[in-house]
Curated annotation (Swiss-Prot):
NCBIfam families: PRK10707.1 (NF007980)
Protein name: Uncharacterized Nudix hydrolase NudL
GO MF annotations in UniProt: coenzyme A diphosphatase activity; magnesium ion binding; manganese ion binding
HAMAP family: Nudix_NudL (MF_01592)
Length: 192
């Protein structure tokens, strides 16, 4: 499938046909969740944020709305929805959850579960100044084009890691966020 003619219906049919398996390896790990907000349009969008530069962790980085699970969250999905509401004012009740991707281990010790949801196109985002410097939308067809991501092999704490790098307009998309977008593309059958 070519990404330039990817409709939301195409994405949904492929996502539902290729449901990801959930990991059961969650013992002794701090849990977090991010929302992958797909904007419902004929040519869908992917909503991303740029973290505030004064944040202690990952300042200025492009990210999905999300964060640590807290005691008020009934589930990982609830955590992703709560964080998206806190960070960019997406009302939880307007998000249509379509599934999750396998969890990803973060460099900060969290196991992060990406939650995929569809949001209406007419939302008015309000970035929390404490956490978010900018909110932007990238065409989903562009985000899922695997050739836009370039690998960088690094060593961290004596282990080899591959991170992915990309640019969209003036936004540098890399690390866990780029890796999650790539996994989403691979999960719906995009070819490298």
């Amino acid at each position: 499938m070519e990404t330039h003619d990817l409709t939301l219906d195409d994405f949904l049919s492929r996502f539902q046909l290729l449901r990801p398996k959930m990991s059961r390896d969650v013992l002794n790990r701090r849990q977090a969740a991010v929302l992958i907000p797909l904007v419902r349009r004929e040519q869908p969008g992917l909503l991303l944020t740029k973290r505030a530069s004064h944040m202690r962790k990952h300042p200025g980085q492009v990210a999905f709305p999300g964060g640590a699970v807290d005691s008020t969250d009934a589930s990982l999905i609830a955590a992703a929805l709560r964080e998206a509401h806190e960070e960019v004012a997406i009302p939880p009740e307007v998000v249509e959850i379509i599934g999750v991707l396998p969890p990803v281990d973060s460099v900060t010790g969290f196991q992060v579960t990406p939650v995929v949801g569809i949001i209406p196109p007419d939302l008015h985002y309000h970035a929390s100044e404490e956490e978010v410097a900018a909110v932007f939308e990238m065409p989903l067809s562009e985000a899922l084009r695997l050739s836009r991501y370039h690998p960088l092999d690094i060593q961290r704490r004596g282990h080899d890691h591959r991170v992915w790098l990309s640019w969209y307009q003036h936004y540098f998309v890399w690390g866990m966020t780029a890796g999650i977008i790539r996994e989403l593309a691979l999960q719906i059958g995009m070819k490298p």
